[in-house]
């Protein structure tokens, strides 16, 4: 998932992991579990 900021990752990661824990690293999202 491409992103410009961590905020861009919250909803896609919420769908993937069920949790909004996410960071934008090198313009792509990194999802973390709960």
From Swiss-Prot:
UniProt-annotated site: Aromatic residue of the functional dyad, residues: 32
InterPro entries, per the entry: Scorpion_toxin-like_sf, Scorpion_toxinS_K_inh
Cellular location(s): Secreted
Disulfide feature: 3-24, 9-29, 13-31, 19-34
Domain of life: Eukaryota
Pfam families: Toxin_2
GO MF term set: ion channel inhibitor activity; potassium channel regulator activity; toxin activity
Residue positions where Cysteine amide is found in the record: 34
Keyword vocabulary terms for this entry: Amidation, Disulfide bond, Ion channel impairing toxin, Neurotoxin, Potassium channel impairing toxin, Secreted, Toxin, Voltage-gated potassium channel impairing toxin
Function: Antagonist of Kv1/KCNA potassium channels. Shows a weak interaction with muscle-type nicotinic acetylcholine receptors (nAChR), since it inhibits alpha-bungarotoxin binding to both muscle-type nAChR from T.californica (IC(50)=490 nM). This suggests it probably weakly inhibits nAChR.
Protein family (similarity comment): Belongs to the short scorpion toxin superfamily. Potassium channel inhibitor family. Alpha-KTx 06 subfamily.
Domain commentary: Has the structural arrangement of an alpha-helix connected to a beta-sheet by disulfide bonds (CSalpha/beta).
Further facts: Negative results: does not inhibit ERG1/Kv11.1/KCNH2 potassium channels. May not inhibit neuronal human alpha-7 nAChR, since it does not inhibit alpha-7 alpha-bungarotoxin binding (IC(50)>>20 uM).
The protein, known as: Potassium channel toxin alpha-KTx 6.13
């Amino acid at each position: 998932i491409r992103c410009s900021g961590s905020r861009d990752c919250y909803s896609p990661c919420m769908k993937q992991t069920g949790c909004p824990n996410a960071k934008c690293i090198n313009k792509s999202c990194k999802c973390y579990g709960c």
